[in-house]
Amino acid sequence: MFKPSFVALALVSYATAQASAPQWGQCGGIGWTGPTACPSGWACQQLNAYYSQCLQGAAPAPARTTAAPPPPPATTAAPPPPTTSAPTGSSPVAGACGAIASTVPNYNNAKLPDPFTFANGTALRTKADWSCRRAEISALIQNYEAGTLPPKPPVVTASFSKSGNTGTLAITAGLSNSQTIKFSPTISYPSGTPPANGWPLIIAYEGGSIPIPAGVATLTYSNSDMAQQNSASSRGQGLFYQLYGSTHSASAMTAWVWGVSRIIDALEMTPTAQINTQRIGVTGCSRDGKGALMAGAFEERIALTIPQESGSGGDACWRLSKYEIDNGNQVQDAVEIVGENVWFSTNFNNYVQKLPTVPEDHHLLAAMVAPRAMISFENTDYLWLSPMSSFGCMTAAHTVWQGLGIADSHGFAQVGGHAHCAWPSSLTPQLNAFINRFLLDQSATTNVFTTNNQFGKVQWNAANWITWTTPTLT
């Protein structure tokens, strides 16, 4: 039998250390044991404590807390206004959705799927219809790309303690009293006397990157403890999988949503925490921005969703990102993402090469937030974020808020001039407007939908992708 020598082992170790990570690949982070070098012309940039990535350019971007230079002026580019149409066909009875489709056999559509038509071809007429369509979209996304989101488990208990302006929410969740997990997120409170209904709260994935205004509490959610995201080898690792098993279909992002829901359960059970559970927001940046969008889509108790620079796999659409790739923009797409990490279910691997057969896309994921509020922020300086895809995808999603008659509950702002996940001060007024209105219950103007139109080698043309006419849902 062959026995490797110490010299051979040393050579293997040396070769592993010298290997370069691929373009856009992971090159560092907590728990990372793979290559740390990048190809020529690419630099290993730390995006957060858990993840560094090979990005184009010779020098890494400054840390998130570094003050960013003012971005170039953004030009307003409003989405197409809704045009009223009279849908044909019967609608589900309000409150009774009937059978919910989780798959659509023989689907084939290279353009963006119509949010206003059920899988069976029936057109939406009413706001109650949207509730049913939203349930259908949820089932489709879980089946095709996210994995199954389990319901509230039989055991959920919580206790709360506070020292100064910092609180600790100790949560136990389990399938039985003998099969539980525990986690304890911390809450940073504003100074002063809380409002009568408690403080509004933002759940911040890994602490978040946005400036939180006065009067809003912040809960730091260590989502990577709930489901690890170090690399493609992280699948089935984390607290969620200790409870449901390492082979559960839920992706890491779906497991994070489950954790957010348990946090809100715990807050509802602990009035001493003095949190207004009717005024909860969620945020995160980059990979955690993808997760924040997923949480806002699936957890209906979230009042305001704020994904930041989530890009492909977040507020970008798979079909549009592929279009960018096909036309010379080096962006992340579905094929690259499923090989990079565990943010999506293994079932999605079956569809990344045949996206037209998928009866959903991320304009529908974002639309699941409606009629609740959402604003997403993107950065055109990083082409791999797929800026045209994000703008086009959110333009398509915006039609749902338009159809519901609440267009100013959905916003989008896209600028450059700052590092990835560094906050540009020029966007603070838009951010504060949404927080003031939807978390602080103050009057604010939230008609925000802007881009600087820096899309690399492509341009957005709504007529090429949006095939539906936006109805006025009654």
Curated annotation (Swiss-Prot):
Annotated keywords: Disulfide bond, Glycoprotein, Hydrolase, Lignin degradation, Secreted, Serine esterase, Signal
Q: Which cysteines are joined by disulfide bonds?
A: 285-421, 317-393
What segments bear the compositional bias annotation Pro residues? 68-84
Q: Does the keyword Secreted apply?
A: yes
Q: List the Gene Ontology MF annotations in alphabetical order.
A: carboxylic ester hydrolase activity; cellulose binding
State the post-translational modifications. Answer: N-glycosylated.
Residue span of region Disordered: 61-91
Subcellular localization(s) per the UniProt record: Secreted
**CBM1 domain location:** 19-55
> Active site located where?
286, 420
Residues annotated as signal peptide? 1-17
Q: What domain of life is recorded for the organism?
A: Eukaryota
EC number(s) for this protein? 3.1.1.117
Q: Which SUPFAM superfamilies match?
A: alpha/beta-Hydrolases, Cellulose-binding domain
| Broad EC category | hydrolase
Q: Which Gene3D superfamilies does the record associate with it?
A: alpha/beta hydrolase (3.40.50.1820)
- Any one of the GO CC terms: extracellular region
Q: Does the keyword Disulfide bond apply?
A: yes
Question: A GO term (biological process) for this protein?
Answer: lignin catabolic process
Binding annotation for substrate: 290, 332, 340, 384
Q: What is this protein called?
A: 4-O-methyl-glucuronoyl methylesterase
The source organism is Cerrena unicolor (Canker rot fungus)
